[in-house]
Amino acid sequence: METSYREEEARRKASLLHCIFFFLLGALAMAAAIAVLHESSYWEWRCNRLTDIVVDGDDGDGPSSSEVVDGGGEWGMVRTRGAQFVVGGGRPFYVNGFNTYWLMVLAVDPSTRGKVTEVFRQAAAVGLTVCRTWAFNDGGWRALQKSPGVYDEEVFKALDFVVSEARKHKIRLILPLINNWDDYGGKAQYVRWAQAAAAGAGADAFFSDETVRGYFKSHVTAVLTRVNAYTGVAYRDDPTIMAWELMNEPRCASDPTGDTLQAWIAEMAFHVKSVDPAHLLGVGAEGFYGPSSPPARLRVNPNADVALAGADFVRNHRVLGVDFASVHVYPDTWLPAGATKEAQLRFATSWVEAHIADAEGALGGMPVLFAEFGVSTRGARAAFNATSRDAFIEAVYGAMLRSTRRGGGGAGALLWQVFPEGTDYMDDGYAVVLPRAAATAGIVAAHSRRLQSFNSRCAWSCRWGCNKRDNDTAETTTAEADVDVSFHHEL
């Protein structure tokens, strides 16, 4: 009897211990799940999305024409955390975007203003989230800035309209502030205004002439502090604007050492941040490797001449105030004439991968945006047609996705360029008219869906795929954000 009693007592104790064990295990699992949900931005995102739907009056299936809710949610300012763009409470924001540079000019005329709305509507339909377009037109036809500090209010209102329409379609904007080239005025127009050319100075005097630099700083201030006539929101306070770019494709071939351009970038980055510390800032560079680059990187350049253009990818993006790296991809115009389609595809892939590696390594974990990529389907050099161009688009998207899947620095790419129907007279061979290019539109939409699957993930699940260095960088960035989120500290 005593033995049986002891055996029964032992069984009861074992059963009790099992119950306690499984209870504690369940409690730990529940605590971990609560911690994960608390850390993630999922519930914050859902709340913000539901608020958007209630306020906008849409059903969640597409963009609304009403005001977008701001605050710290889905439509707050885009920021950087480590090698990624983030929105809201830290939700990743991988970019699938496009260029349509002429939006402001067409918005001036009521008869063509509808093209702005049309291109945003078509872009949003395939999931494009960022548009890069000019915030300048210096001198000449429909000039925004007619002379130094003198602006055409109707053209400024046209830019206001572009920003307002982008907001309605939930498309963010990247706005370059001047052109390296003569189109839309560019740096040469500033030099002419300052009459520096009378002393034999070329367009590169833009970077060194004190009067010219003063003109440009005044223009920067005028644009950044502009109050939108449609929304009543100052540009520097508007989260519709994702980022400013100092210049479209800056080069200073008159000083191949790169020192002149480097000094200008540093000066202007400081000025932009002094006026608008809230928005991201990019250089607008093409990504050429210059004199400070190791031989292995110089060999990545498409030709030897670009190393003497005065630009220097890594050095230019180490400047205080520059928040992300920018690169362009044009194998058809950069590679030697006669380069085959296969050679151009290989170059595009290696060019993208090299810059992602440098953004993660040499730049200490900085997002890199491929702000222009495209090939022409016209002209004697064209190796692609409207159909085979899809292979180039897929090559760039593929390189981006490989980075995205591992939590790398490839933050997005913007196709050059999306046109609505009825604008063929402006097409130089690079235009993609989405309604007439079903296969291309399908590729773009599929890439948008893939990126959205990453953008919709909670912050913790994105970090799960990153290596420890990226996590440490993200934590450091978060800690520093309370002090100053406006500057990427020079290495």
UniProtKB/Swiss-Prot annotation:
Tissue spec. comment: Expression not detected.
Residues passing through the membrane, by range: none
Residues that carry a glycan: N385, N471
The protein's Enzyme Commission number: 3.2.1.78
Biological processes per GO annotation: polysaccharide catabolic process
InterPro entries documented for this protein: Glyco_hydro_5, Glycoside_hydrolase_SF, MAN-like
A Gene Ontology term for the protein's cellular component: extracellular region
Gene3D superfamilies in alphabetical order: Glycosidases
Keywords (A to Z) from UniProt: Glycoprotein, Glycosidase, Hydrolase, Secreted, Signal
Localization of this protein: Secreted
Pfam family, one: Cellulase
Catalysed reaction equations from the record: Random hydrolysis of (1->4)-beta-D-mannosidic linkages in mannans, galactomannans and glucomannans
Lineage top rank: taxon: Eukaryota
Protein name as it appears in the record: Putative mannan endo-1,4-beta-mannosidase 5
